[in-house]
Swiss-Prot record:
This is ADP-ribosylation factor 1. Its EC number is 3.6.5.2. A lipid is attached at G2 (N-myristoyl glycine). One of its GO terms (cellular component) is Golgi apparatus.
Amino acid sequence: MGLSFGKLFSRLFAKKEMRILMVGLDAAGKTTILYKLKLGEIVTTIPTIGFNVETVEYKNISFTVWDVGGQDKIRPLWRHYFQNTQGLIFVVDSNDRDRVVEARDELHRMLNEDELRDAVLLVFANKQDLPNAMNAAEITDKLGLHSLRQRHWYIQSTCATSGEGLYEGLDWLSNNIASKA
């Protein structure tokens, strides 16, 4: 009896670890999001060549977040980060109407990869503070998210610079990754 209570206690209160891959087209705001979550402040960023990785502690969960560069020349490298990924954060610049089709194509190409078949998908519709930003419903439509019948997905409106929506996204991720575990 004591052993089962101990197991229950540790399951409830032990720190959980989750591996998250954050990708998206260049200049979508991935690195700004990562460091807003990690440091709580806005950092000056330059285009990511390669990756940034940080551990973000939130609600007794340790998220290891891999922020991988999004320039078209280095997108083929994304697949090297797929293994053991539990959650995928796809960041979209909601103000970039010219490249939303490109974002959709990259997202669907990635979701067809076998190594990501069990990963849940969180889309951050970023840069919602800009006046011409597409809202979450429009991004959902443009990215073809409703066609993802076999995948847990969610879209969250965000503003990386203010932090708005970021923790709501992490809440959804933690609840949905935990329910699949």
